[in-house]
């Protein structure tokens, strides 16, 4: 919604995004959606998360927009990527803000938790600028942080203010979230989310057994079809990465070598939930730097 996002012009960028998000939210409020049970609700708008450099900007724009009185009763959504060590801290800030909002009679918001699908772009930026890699550099910590965020979000006092969207095609991650929701008696406050055309047999089974499932489908006009290329490349990467569940999903059998490989990875990440790094990889603070003429 804004092509000139700049971290250096933080306040100005957030103000512009706030104006544009407000316009979108107003239209969403004016156009209702009828659920299968006949209940009418305002159209739902989810604010996606892409590049690491936009993380704080996206969060600030989301909060500032919803803090306006006209959106006090509107439920919008935001996405956080578990492959960023920073995301769990953002989730906690979001949750505390949402709790205060709900306590005052405001509408809850929704958080979609994903693992992240822009690793190659983040690696490129890191190399080109000689910066530390923003995401984790290993899958174990990504998976552990994902569970850490899901576990925190599933706590009854948290999920009632910040409803959850559990976005995954991994059977182990889906089962982990489902068990937590059942144990905490919060199944009414979360739903599974998947992508159209990905692990369709898993999607069908989930719909038959879990009921509430949100399916994402990309849309691009013929004139703007080039915009779909980035989406396609990310999906190809997810379907071929050696450690990724989707690589093995089509013919996966319980008890097979592939199943045991994936199970062991899941169990290792469960053991590392509280050990995954929770502080940013990029810690440069220019306000504390000392000028060295020799450099």
Outline where the language-model segments fall:
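Positively charged, amphipathic and often flexible ligand-engagement surfaces
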Residues: 1-294
């Amino acid at each position: 919604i804004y092509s000139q996002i700049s971290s250096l012009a933080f306040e100005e960028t957030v103000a512009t995004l706030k104006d544009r998000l407000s316009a979108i939210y107003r239209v969403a409020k004016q156009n209702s959606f009828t659920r299968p049970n006949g209940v009418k609700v305002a159209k739902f708008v989810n604010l996606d998360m892409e590049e690491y450099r936009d993380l704080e900007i996206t969060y600030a724009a989301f909060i500032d927009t919803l803090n306006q009185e006209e959106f006090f009763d509107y439920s919008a959504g935001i996405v956080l990527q578990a492959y960023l060590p920073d995301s769990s801290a953002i989730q906690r800030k979001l949750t505390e803000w949402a709790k205060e909002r709900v306590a005052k009679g405001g509408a809850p918001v929704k958080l979609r938790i994903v693992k992240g699908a822009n690793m190659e772009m983040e690696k490129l930026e890191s190399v080109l600028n000689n910066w530390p890699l923003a995401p984790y550099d290993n899958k174990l910590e990504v998976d552990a942080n994902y569970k850490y965020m899901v576990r925190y979000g599933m706590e009854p006092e948290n999920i009632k203010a910040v409803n959850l969207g559990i976005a995954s095609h991994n059977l182990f991650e889906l089962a982990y979230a489902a068990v937590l929701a059942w144990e905490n008696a919060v199944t009414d406050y979360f739903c599974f989310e998947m992508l159209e055309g990905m692990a369709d047999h898993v999607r069908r089974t989930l719909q038959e057994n879990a009921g509430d499932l949100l399916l994402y489908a990309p849309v691009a006009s013929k004139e703007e079809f080039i915009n779909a290329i980035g989406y396609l490349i990310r999906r190809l990467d997810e379907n071929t990465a050696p450690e990724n569940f989707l690589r093995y999903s089509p013919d996966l059998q319980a008890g097979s070598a592939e199943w045991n490989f994936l199970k062991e990875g899941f169990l290792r990440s469960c053991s590392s939930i509280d050990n995954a790094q929770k502080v940013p990889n990029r810690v440069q603070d220019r306000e504390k730097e000392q000028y060295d003429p020799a450099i």
